[in-house]
């Protein structure tokens, strides 16, 4: 009979690995941003980098639920894991990111919607399918913009139909999805993690930071 061996990691080893993961993600975020200073263009660069580096799980390989940095090192993951990597990158480059999966009624697919904060509002993007919507002024659509979906146009690589329903259907409840959204990014940053431990900052669980500005 196989025996389970438990490795008890000493505190110094935990701290060292925590620091290494933080440093890795800062380096990846800097590389992915490519020096771009405009927030919208930078976010789209981060989307492109994530999709180029993290591919869908190869056929025959299992889904592995582990640390965000391991997803990048492994170079594959599912839709939620791509969303985790992307929102971690946006958080590290100054725009807080969160995500949650949503499947509209009648759809045979789901979309991991990513929410990226910009000046008190939240852009909405779909990393797995490479899609988002734009306003008439050419800006990435925010949660508030989806109150008038007829004014928006589909951009990126996402199809017009997905899972048997119009692609826009996956964005029909963005405010509700946002209220359930979460992030693990800030929890791997040393300063934020310390504040969480001593209770001065909430954990990055669902709805931890449901901030919406009225239009």
How should each PLM-predicted stretch be described?
Residues 12, 19, 28, 49, ...:
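A residue-identity detector for tryptophan
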Residues 15, 31, 52-54, 58, ...:
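Enriched - but not universal
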Residues 38-44, 91-98, 119-122:
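Loop/turn elements at helix/coil->beta-strand transitions in domains of secreted/extracellular proteins
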Residues 3, 8, 14-15, 21-24, ...:
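A general marker of short, structured functional hotspots
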Residues 1-74:
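Secondary-structure boundary elements
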Residues 106-110, 116-215:
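His-Asp-centered catalytic microenvironments across diverse enzyme cores
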Residues 52-113, 117:
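Active-site neighborhood of thiol-dependent amide/isopeptide-bond enzymes
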């Amino acid at each position: 009979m196989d025996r389970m061996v438990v490795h008890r990691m000493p505190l110094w080893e935990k701290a060292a690995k925590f620091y290494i993961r933080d440093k890795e993600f800062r380096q990846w975020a800097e590389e992915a941003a490519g020096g771009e200073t405009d927030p919208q263009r930078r976010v789209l660069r981060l989307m492109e980098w994530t999709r180029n580096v993290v591919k869908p799980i190869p056929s025959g390989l299992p889904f592995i639920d582990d640390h965000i940095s391991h997803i990048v090192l492994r170079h594959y993951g599912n839709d939620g894991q791509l969303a985790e990597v992307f929102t971690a990158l946006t958080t590290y480059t100054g725009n807080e990111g969160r995500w949650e999966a949503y499947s509209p009624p009648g759809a045979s697919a789901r979309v991991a919607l990513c929410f990226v904060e910009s000046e008190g509002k939240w852009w909405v993007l779909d990393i797995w399918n490479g899609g988002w919507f734009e306003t008439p002024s050419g800006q990435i659509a925010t949660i508030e913009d989806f109150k008038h979906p007829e004014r928006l146009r589909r951009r990126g690589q996402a199809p017009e139909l997905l899972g048997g329903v119009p692609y826009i259907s996956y964005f029909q409840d963005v405010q509700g999805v946002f209220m359930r959204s979460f992030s693990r990014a800030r929890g791997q940053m040393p300063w934020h993690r310390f504040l969480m431990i001593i209770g001065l900052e909430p954990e990055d669980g669902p709805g931890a930071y449901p901030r919406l500005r009225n239009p």
